[in-house]
UniProtKB/Swiss-Prot annotation:
Phosphotyrosine found at: Y170, Y268
Designated name of the protein: Probable serine/threonine-protein kinase PBL17
GO cellular component terms, semicolon-separated: plasma membrane
Catalytic activity, EC: 2.7.11.1
Keyword set includes Cell membrane: yes
Protein keywords: ATP-binding, Cell membrane, Kinase, Lipoprotein, Membrane, Myristate, Nucleotide-binding, Palmitate, Phosphoprotein, Plant defense, Serine/threonine-protein kinase, Transferase
Enzyme class at the top of the EC tree: transferase
Membrane topology listed for this record: Lipid-anchor
Residues recorded as bearing Phosphothreonine in the entry: T79, T255, T260
Gene label: PBL17
Family per similarity comment: Belongs to the protein kinase superfamily. Ser/Thr protein kinase family.
Listed InterPro entries: Kinase-like_dom_sf, Plant_Ser_Thr_Prot_Kinase, Prot_kinase_dom, Protein_kinase_ATP_BS, Ser-Thr/Tyr_kinase_cat_dom, Ser/Thr_kinase_AS
Catalysed conversion reaction: L-seryl-[protein] + ATP = O-phospho-L-seryl-[protein] + ADP + H(+); L-threonyl-[protein] + ATP = O-phospho-L-threonyl-[protein] + ADP + H(+)
Domain Protein kinase: 90-370
Length: 442
């Protein structure tokens, strides 16, 4: 059974949410949530609702506002009793996951919940009043997702804020999180083509946020927050840490450092200066995880490999070294040129200098060039495997296989860590403001 949300990491500080104006594109039809598999020609928009026409941005709502009127188009207010009906009285076997924020249940919204509702599977997140997420993060999700509509953002169906209860109702994502698929020990079904499609979808979601009239910085990009539907279409979820971008002649937003250690951009960790390129760094971490099949932070690995970026980034521009560390579960599924293009993109996104990172629109363009080639390549691979044949679409040097141990098993040769030309950045002393990855995942 897929899930919509996974057990979330702990966040220790909360940033003040401000205005949430978004951009609509005049003269274009909005095709929202009726998504093609390739996400092309689908336009995101701001949900207009009582704002004087034209879908103008709305001021953020507070709890009192939301208790009386949803204020946002296509977002419903549910009573707590209706939430109990939708989850069969919050049955334990309906639990999809739980963490510091509370519990996520699967549910069904239908006629038994409210007359006129067509039966719809949903995921219902109930916040723990004493948990790590508070009203500010809950409000951020409602205020952002209440106004934003895009094929690569998870859809908010409704909410409940009756008395002290805080619940969010989302569309159900049948395949669960990218994290669940990418890091499973056995049976990984994420081919090279699927990974690149997921990366493209996530990039489109970020590009949409950054391209708003007043840009939005997502601030919490990670595999646990990328959800997949039955067609492996990816959507960004969990907007509790989202923040309005700089306005006017501002170059950055100064804010408390929040996020997940291993994903946060170094300049943000050290200074609290937040820009859209902080998200680009997080996207680079995501690409690296998908290329290597390894978590951004993992203290069970060798000491020098604890931080994936510090260990692997210097190797991304070296063909032979990269082939030795690439996820072996993708063996033979990619061409060398495509691999090096994605690795080079990840390398740029992970630049220590924010100005050296590309904009997300450029990232989308680069990943788009891989799509057609990837579709054709997967078809070739499927045909070859159906005939009992195998093929390797890249060349590896003879020494890339490493040596064999006494039992005849291959073992890889150790790699050098950080490039000598790059100065190390000491981020350990800043970790107190970031969350450690939750060891309990769904």
């Amino acid at each position: 059974m897929g899930i919509c949300f996974s057990a979330e990491d702990q966040h220790y500080q909360f940033s003040q949410q401000q205005n949430y104006p978004k951009k609509t594109t005049p003269g274009k039809k909005a095709a929202v949530y009726l998504m093609k598999s390739d996400c092309e020609d689908v336009v995101g928009k701001v949900s207009g609702s009582g704002s004087g026409g034209g879908g103008l941005p709305l001021a953020p709502k507070n709890i009192k506002d939301l208790q009386s009127n949803p204020g946002y188009e296509n977002v419903d207010i549910f009573t707590y009793e209706e939430m109990k009906i939708a989850t069969k009285q919050f049955r334990p076997d309906y639990i999809l996951g739980e963490g510091g924020f509370g519990v996520v249940y699967k549910g069904v919204i239908d006629e038994s919940v409210r007359v006129g509702f067509k039966s719809t599977k949903v995921a219902i997140k109930e916040l723990n009043p004493e948990g790590f997420q508070g009203d500010r993060e809950w409000l951020a999700e409602v205020n952002y997702l209440g106004q934003l509509s895009h094929p690569n953002l998870v859809k908010l169906i409704g909410y409940c804020c009756e008395d002290d209860h805080r619940l969010l109702v989302y569309e159900y994502m049948a395949m669960g999180s990218l994290e669940k698929h990418l890091f499973r020990r056995v049976g990984c079904t994420l081919t090279w083509t699927k990974r690149m499609k997921i990366a493209l979808d996530a990039a489109k979601g970020l590009a949409f946020l950054h391209g708003a009239e007043r840009s939005i910085i997502y601030r919490d990009l990670k595999t646990a927050n990328i959800l997949l539907d039955e067609g492996y279409n990816a959507k960004l979820s969990d907007f509790g840490l989202a923040k309005d971008g700089p306005r006017g002649d501002q170059t950055h937003v100064s804010t408390r450092v929040m996020g997940t250690y291993g994903y946060a951009a170094p300049e943000y960790v050290m200074t609290g200066h937040l820009t859209s390129r902080s998200d680009v760094y997080g996207f680079g971490v995501l690409l690296l995880e998908m290329l290597l099949g390894k978590r951004a932070m993992d203290k069970s690995r060798a000491c020098r490999e604890h931080n994936l970026v510090e260990w692997a980034r210097p190797l991304l521009n070296h063909n032979k070294k990269l082939l030795r560390i690439i996820d072996p579960r993708m063996d033979g599924q990619y061409g060398t040129k495509a691999l090096m293009k994605v690795a080079g993109l990840a390398y740029q996104c992970l630049s220590q200098n924010p100005k050296g990172r590309p904009l997300m629109n450029h990232v989308v363009e680069v990943l788009e060039t891989l799509k057609d080639d990837g579709d054709a390549q997967e078809e070739v691979m499927t045909n070859l495997h159906s005939r009992g044949k195998s093929v390797t679409l890249y060349e590896a040097s003879s020494d890339s296989q490493g040596t064999r141990d006494g039992n005849g098993q291959r073992r890889r040769r150790p790699e050098s860590g950080r490039s000598k030309s790059e100065a190390a950045v000491d981020t350990e002393k800043y970790v107190s403001t970031l969350s450690e990855p939750d060891t309990t995942k769904i």
